[in-house]
Amino acid sequence: FTIEDLLKHYLQKKFHILERLATIYDKLGVVMRKASKYEQALDYFTKAQNIIDINHIKNPELTSDIYNDMGVIYINLDIFDKALANYQKAREIRESVENPDLEQIAYSYHNIGTVYQRQKKYADAITWHKKALEIRQEIYPDNEPIIAASLTMIGNDYTQAAKNDSSYHFNDAFEYFAKGLEIRKLTLGETHPDTAWSYQSIGLWHFYQGEYEEAIENYLKCLSIRKTILQPSHAYTAEISYLLGEAYLKINQIHSAKEHLLLAEKIQASLHKVKALEKTQHLLKECSLS
């Protein structure tokens, strides 16, 4: 062996070890994210990204996954500009490889659409979510749960758009929700977290049209599922509890409203969800005045 051969072998081994370390950090970040420990998750993802960047490691799949995972954290922290930037970087990498993974590209499109939805840019949200749906319909059977995810998100887009823009109509949303829920109940079952999302979405659809009893009926189904399968302090449990409190307040059932809002407040405070906590505390004040 020449010195050059030994150096090359050393560098290859070094990069392999660093690549493995970045992968481990990324997986640890995912574990923290699933436990709603977003700051710890972001720390792990940042460590993974730094290893990739500093050492110029060429692994498009891993790099795009890290950017995507960071985007998930930022959207959960309501930092939408950073979420969008990371999702776009993941998309660019996934589209640029020699043999693009259409499934992963669809995920990027879906995630970008979700950021636009949260930013209330509904036309952009619909565009990106429909792009994701088109790809998924090409590569999956019609009753795949991933198809239901796209259908439900497009329903959400139309619901939010109709709430804020008179050029959209609530009826545009319902066919997407109904088909999405049908697929999820058939393939995932009644107690799956994605089925809970369908019930929450349909509940919101009713709420925005002033159909509060129907909203509560769907919200309660969602809450029942989440209490069964999620940790007690999960952000999604807080979210549906807030929505229930809001709906009960609309029909002047103050005791029920306060019960659910207090649960939401407790969870949001533990997760440092400042904006959500402010909204919950505002509704609690309304309960006190009623």
Task: Give short role names for the model-derived ranges.
Residues 19-34, 61-76, 103-118, 145-160, ...:
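Conserved alpha-helical positions within TPR/SEL1-like repeat arrays
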Residues 254-272:
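TPR/TPR-like (Sel1-like) alpha-helical repeat modules
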Residues 2-10, 31, 51-54, 93-97, ...:
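Residue position in alpha-helical solenoids
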Residues 29, 56, 98, 113, ...:
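Short coil/turn linking the two alpha-helices of tandem helical-hairpin repeats
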Residues 1-3, 38, 45, 52, ...:
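Hydrophobic/aromatic packing residues within the alpha-helices of TPR/SEL1-like helical repeat arrays
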Residues 11-19, 56-64, 81, 98-106, ...:
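Helix N-cap/loop-to-helix boundary motif
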